[in-house]
Amino acid sequence: MIGTMRIGIGLPAAVPGADMARLGSFAAQAEQAGFESVGVIDRLVYDNLDPLIALAAAAACTSRIGLISTVVNVNWRANPRLLAKQISSVVRVSGGRFTAGLGMGGWPADYEASDIAPNGQGKRFAAALAVMDEAWRSPGERPSVVLGGLAPAAIARSAAPVSDGWVAPLFGFEVLQQGIAAARDAWARSGRAGLPRVITARYFSLGPQADAVADAYLEHYYGAEYFAPARSDTLTSAGGVRAELARLAGAGCTDVVLYPCSGDLDQVGRLSEAVGDAAVP
């Protein structure tokens, strides 16, 4: 930890070419290294694992480490009651370790593949959350929920009773700062005690050819339109990791998940060394 900010590492579940059969070993090494959580991201039309299945695999190979989604995209999953069941299943098999970051989903291809119109997503998301909230009435089934989104209405929604806070985007420090201020304001206006949980994430690549590995992965994942902003916040040196963690903690983040650009198991050890004592609870 840095101050009170918890440091997690992402699973390589969205890294094309990664050996997904070793995902459990990756999670076990992360737990042994002292990270607070393992995280997943979500897309449909891409070479990645379903995030909930990836987290269930991680849960089976660990006993203490937290599980975080940043985020599971709700709106192109047509049945929110089914999604609530899947999420509560991860809660139960993990012994309550799952923090469910939930969002609407922004990739047009995912909506096209799901035959769901991209308009009206705010209302769709709110309706789905209501269904899921009702489904999580039994003891031991409700996850800690944090809500993602960048629009003012989405950030305001993070103060809803179902939510424990806000999931910030993977890059953009100014956007993060503005979002934290807006989330805290919404929290106060809603009469919530204390401050919201704020979860953010960054990409990292460490070791030989770190920059080349990061370039190749981010170009493949984001394409030309979003490559530059994603790459600008990607961490490719130990000093860069430590400096960014200090900056995120100073901004008010409660959790950060660092996502690898490679599926190599050595990324766990390299990141642990880069973070140093801050990674040890």
PLM-predicted stretches and their roles:
Residues M1-P281:
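Active-site-adjacent structural elements that line small-molecule/cofactor binding pockets in enzymes
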